[in-house]
Amino acid sequence: MPRLKVKLVKSPIGYPKDQKAALKALGLRRLQQERVLEDTPAIRGNVEKVAHLVRVEVVE
């Protein structure tokens, strides 16, 4: 199953609470922090909410 490498590249300060909650659900707390996550619909939904704050790449 493919996985997603998600990296927080922009600060969530000043953005709505739902976007901060999406980052928390992805496990991203600090700038430049990376997580490798399973590619599920729930993860994809959270990534799409904060697409302007993160960088995503598919990892096999």
UniProtKB/Swiss-Prot annotation:
GO molecular function, one term: structural constituent of ribosome
GO cellular component, one term: cytosolic large ribosomal subunit
Gene: rpmD
An individual GO BP term: translation
Pfam families given in the database record: Ribosomal_L30 (PF00327)
Keyword annotations of the record: Ribonucleoprotein, Ribosomal protein
UniProt cross-references to Gene3D superfamilies, sorted A to Z: Ribosomal protein L30, ferredoxin-like fold domain
Family of the protein in this entry: Belongs to the universal ribosomal protein uL30 family.
Top-level taxonomic group: Bacteria
Name under which the protein is recorded: Large ribosomal subunit protein uL30
InterPro entries per record: Ribo_uL30_ferredoxin-like_sf, Ribosomal_uL30_bac-type, Ribosomal_uL30_CS, Ribosomal_uL30_ferredoxin-like
Known partners and oligomeric status: Part of the 50S ribosomal subunit.
